[in-house]
């Protein structure tokens, strides 16, 4: 790649969060890209001899569904910053448009007021065209952008400090090595996951094509199953849910889709839902995990052409979640339904007996309480 590749190493609440890697559009806006490049390297000073660098500065303004803003390394609140050309420099051109998420663009206070502040778009922002100079894009770890975007804020400032702990530029050899490592993962040599967490952020796959979404989801399922077998239930849950997001780009396939493709989607979506539910059940009990299990298994139960054993498994796992939620009535109903699907299943029978015993004990306790009140 002939354009500059720059990076930020990010910490969130003083904990390492990963690296954002950028392509700078030297070929379209060389002056603007050069400013960002040298602020990443930190090899320039101003007239007073003060170092100009992003390292140590923070993202001071984050608006979900819009953008993340940073680069004010002098004041940290959006009122400061300085370019390598002086305090401000002119708008180079507006050739590139804000037509997608994950673009780097210059923040400003009006025409010709570019300094060091920048923003990363998280959605298309066409209303900024002709006002802000687009000069790059996030190419790797867009999931980290989404993580930052979803941090709660107070007056648009993240409640957890998001800091650029270090920044720099990759040499051509370093970038080639990074690309080789990603290709090795894609080839499955280490069972890795190279895809962005959200399909709309993944440029290496056209998730709008059902066949491509299916391939990614299938590979993610393999990664999730590997993590599950290793006892890494939280990681496995994350992979299964990520796989579902890729499938869910196509919640319903077109009517003219081949029957084999429709069945492939169904037969992959079902185990992803039930496996994710099982992972959540193996995590420490909480209202969030039990609600997640109910949601996942309820989705599974809406899928067409379920076999008796598939329906029984989903009902059983939903019943387990209802038990955690202390909704024994709903649990008993699901367990009885599961028993109709899988007669004689030892796990279902045992849990049903436990739930019935609990409900009986509760009714007896209530009866005794009423007897004391009115006896």
UniProtKB/Swiss-Prot annotation:
It is found in: Cytoplasm. InterPro entries: Cyclophilin-like_dom_sf, Cyclophilin-type_PPIase_dom, TPR-like_helical_dom_sf. One of its GO terms (cellular component) is intracellular membrane-bounded organelle. It catalyses: [protein]-peptidylproline (omega=180) = [protein]-peptidylproline (omega=0). It is an enzyme of class 5 (isomerase). GO terms for molecular function: cyclosporin A binding; peptidyl-prolyl cis-trans isomerase activity. SUPFAM superfamilies: Cyclophilin-like (SSF50891), TPR-like (SSF48452). Keywords: Cytoplasm, Isomerase, Repeat, Rotamase, TPR repeat. Its EC number is 5.2.1.8. PROSITE patterns: CSA_PPIASE_2. Its main location: cytoplasm. TPR repeats lie at residues 217-250, 270-307, 312-345. PANTHER family: PEPTIDYL-PROLYL CIS-TRANS ISOMERASE, PEPTIDYL-PROLYL CIS-TRANS ISOMERASE D-RELATED. Belongs to the cyclophilin-type PPIase family. PPIase D subfamily. PPIases accelerate the folding of proteins. It catalyzes the cis-trans isomerization of proline imidic peptide bonds in oligopeptides. This is Peptidyl-prolyl cis-trans isomerase D. The gene is CPR6.
């Amino acid at each position: 790649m002939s354009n500059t590749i720059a990076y930020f190493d990010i910490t969130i609440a003083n904990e390492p969060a990963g690296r954002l890697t950028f392509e700078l559009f030297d070929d379209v806006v060389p002056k603007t890209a050069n400013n960002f490049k040298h602020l990443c390297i930190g090899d320039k000073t101003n007239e007073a001899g003060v170092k100009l660098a992003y390292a140590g500065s923070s993202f001071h303004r984050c608006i979900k569904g819009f953008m993340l803003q940073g680069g004010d390394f002098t004041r940290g609140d959006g009122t400061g910053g300085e370019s390598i050309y002086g305090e401000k420099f002119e708008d180079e051109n507006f050739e590139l448009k804000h037509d997608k998420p994950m673009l780097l663009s210059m923040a400003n206070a009006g025409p010709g007021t570019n300094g060091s502040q920048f923003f990363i778009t998280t959605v298309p922002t066409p209303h900024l065209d002709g006002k802000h100079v687009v000069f790059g894009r996030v190419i790797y770890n867009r999931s980290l952008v989404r993580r930052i975007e979803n941090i709660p804020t107070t007056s648009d400032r993240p409640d957890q400090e998001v800091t650029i702990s270090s920044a720099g530029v990759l040499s051509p050899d370093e970038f080639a090595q990074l690309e080789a490592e990603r290709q090795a993962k894609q080839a499955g040599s280490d069972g890795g996951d190279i895809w962005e967490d959200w399909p709309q952020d993944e440029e290496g796959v056209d998730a709008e094509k059902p066949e491509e979404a299916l391939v990614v989801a299938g590979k993610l399922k393999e990664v999730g199953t590997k993590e599950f077998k290793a006892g890494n239930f939280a990681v496995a849950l994350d992979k299964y849910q990520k796989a579902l997001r890729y499938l869910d780009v196509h919640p319903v396939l077109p009517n003219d889709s081949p029957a084999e493709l429709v069945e492939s989607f169904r037969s992959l979506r079902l185990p992803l839902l039930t496996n994710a539910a099982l992972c959540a059940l193996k995590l420490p009990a909480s209202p969030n995990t039990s609600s997640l299990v109910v949601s996942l298994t309820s989705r599974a139960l809406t899928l067409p052409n379920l076999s008796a054993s598939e329906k029984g498994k989903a009902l059983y796992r939903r019943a387990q979640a209802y038990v955690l939620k202390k909704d024994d009535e709903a649990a008993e109903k699901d367990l009885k339904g599961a028993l109709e699907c899988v007669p004689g299943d030892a796990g279902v029978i045992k849990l049903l007996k436990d739930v019935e015993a609990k409900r009986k004990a509760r009714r007896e306790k209530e009866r005794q309480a009423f007897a004391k009140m009115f006896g």
